[in-house]
Structures are given as structure tokens and as C-alpha cells.
């Protein structure tokens, strides 16, 4: 569990650096990265048949299409919530990072 807390801390730190960068390129990269992470989490959770408590955070349309949300900060907060709620492991982040780098 400590590994997860450390990983999530660095992920939050990376998010804050992207948001504070103030550059369009960094923001575009963040949008792409967060979107990939979001879909990777949903796919992983569905494959393992883990129940996601989305109803407490947002409506069902959010699951169907993240494009419905204009604010990617909301998307990243939801991703962090899912990570916290499901207590994902560092191995999960390694798999996600491999997918991001392969694109």
C-alpha cells in the first residue's frame, strides 16, 4: 500500500506541474495522457469485473464518452478518484506507462 501512495503522490505532482506549466504543448500532452489513462483504467477494471462507484462522482454519460466533458481537470480528478477507490498497484502504472509509450 505504501508503494501505491508514493506512486499516486508523484502522479499528482506531475499533474500539478503540467497544469502550472502554462504552455499549450504541455496542456495538450496532459489531455492525451489523462485520456489514455482514463480509458486504460476503465478497460482494466471492466476486464477484472471490478465495480466502479461512478454514481457518487458523476453521471453515466461520463463513462460512455469522456469527450462530453470540456474540462480535462475534471477528468483527471475522476481518474485520481478511481485510483484511490480501487487502490491500484504500481504494476498497474507500469503497464499503463508501457501503453502510453507505445502509442
Swiss-Prot record:
Keywords: Signal. Residues 1-21 form the signal peptide. It comes from the Eukaryota. One of its GO terms (cellular component) is endoplasmic reticulum. This is Uncharacterized protein YMR316C-A. The lineage of its organism: Eukaryota, Fungi, Dikarya, Ascomycota, Saccharomycotina.
Amino acid at each position: 500500500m505504501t508503494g501505491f501512495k508514493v506512486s499516486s503522490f508523484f502522479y499528482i505532482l506531475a499533474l500539478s506541474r503540467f497544469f502550472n506549466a502554462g504552455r499549450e504543448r504541455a496542456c495538450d500532452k496532459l489531455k492525451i495522457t489523462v485520456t489514455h489513462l482514463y480509458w486504460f483504467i476503465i478497460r482494466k477494471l471492466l476486464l477484472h469485473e471490478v465495480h466502479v462507484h461512478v454514481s457518487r462522482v458523476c453521471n453515466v454519460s461520463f463513462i460512455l464518452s469522456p469527450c462530453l466533458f470540456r474540462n480535462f481537470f475534471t477528468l483527471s480528478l475522476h481518474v485520481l478518484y478511481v485510483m484511490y477507490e480501487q487502490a491500484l498497484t504500481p504494476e498497474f502504472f507500469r503497464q499503463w506507462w508501457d501503453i502510453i509509450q507505445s502509442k
